[in-house]
Amino acid sequence: MADIKNNPEYSSFFGVMGASSAMVFSAMGAAYGTAKSGTGIAAMSVMRPELIMKSIIPVVMAGIIAIYGLVVAVLIANSLTDGITLYRSFLQLGAGLSVGLSGLAAGFAIGIVGDAGVRGTAQQPRLFVGMILILIFAEVLGLYGLIVALILSTK
């Protein structure tokens, strides 16, 4: 009876949802960041095509957010078993939501800052360093979620 209480049939569902949410939410954030900063690069490159390669940094940083989600999703998926406990699957759900939602927020921040920063850098090149610093702070938001997710998934 105690085994059914700790290991119900539906317990693996929460682990799968953790892996799915890690990938889905972080990919949504990365996609938004890529699209938003990419449109800024496209608009800026009409007037200053020589700055395209220098302005690609926000797109790269947005893509890294999806890698965070992929790492956690793979870790969770590899640790799923038939007899997983409810406690362990809730930890996996928490890990997936942690990296996924922080990746979503970081992607939004990177997209908005990248768009405005690229357009501003085209007009005033001294803004480049400030844009990079703000992008680093936005990227760290996703990194915090990755750290919490790794702690939760390895517990």
UniProtKB/Swiss-Prot annotation:
Family statement: Belongs to the V-ATPase proteolipid subunit family.
Protein purpose: Proton-conducting pore forming subunit of the V0 complex of vacuolar(H+)-ATPase (V-ATPase), a multisubunit enzyme composed of a peripheral complex (V1) that hydrolyzes ATP and a membrane integral complex (V0) that translocates protons. V-ATPase is responsible for acidifying and maintaining the pH of intracellular compartments and in some cell types, is targeted to the plasma membrane, where it is responsible for acidifying the extracellular environment.
SUPFAM superfamilies, alphabetized: F1F0 ATP synthase subunit C
GO molecular function, one term: proton-transporting ATPase activity, rotational mechanism
Location of the protein in the cell: Cytoplasmic vesicle, Clathrin-coated vesicle membrane; Cytoplasmic vesicle, Secretory vesicle, Synaptic vesicle membrane
Recorded topology in the membrane: Multi-pass membrane protein
Known partners and oligomeric status: V-ATPase is a heteromultimeric enzyme made up of two complexes: the ATP-hydrolytic V1 complex and the proton translocation V0 complex. The V1 complex consists of three catalytic AB heterodimers that form a heterohexamer, three peripheral stalks each consisting of EG heterodimers, one central rotor including subunits D and F, and the regulatory subunits C and H. The proton translocation complex V0 consists of the proton transport subunit a, a ring of proteolipid subunits c9c'', rotary subunit d, subunits e and f, and the accessory subunits ATP6AP1/Ac45 and ATP6AP2/PRR.
Lineage of the species this protein comes from: Eukaryota, Metazoa, Chordata, Craniata, Vertebrata
Ranges facing Lumenal side: 1-10, 77-92, 153-155
Organism of this sequence: Rattus norvegicus
Residue ranges that the UniProt entry lists as topological domain Cytoplasmic: 34-55, 115-131
Domain of life per record: Eukaryota
Protein name, per record: V-type proton ATPase 16 kDa proteolipid subunit c
Membrane spanning stretches: 11-33, 56-76, 93-114, 132-152
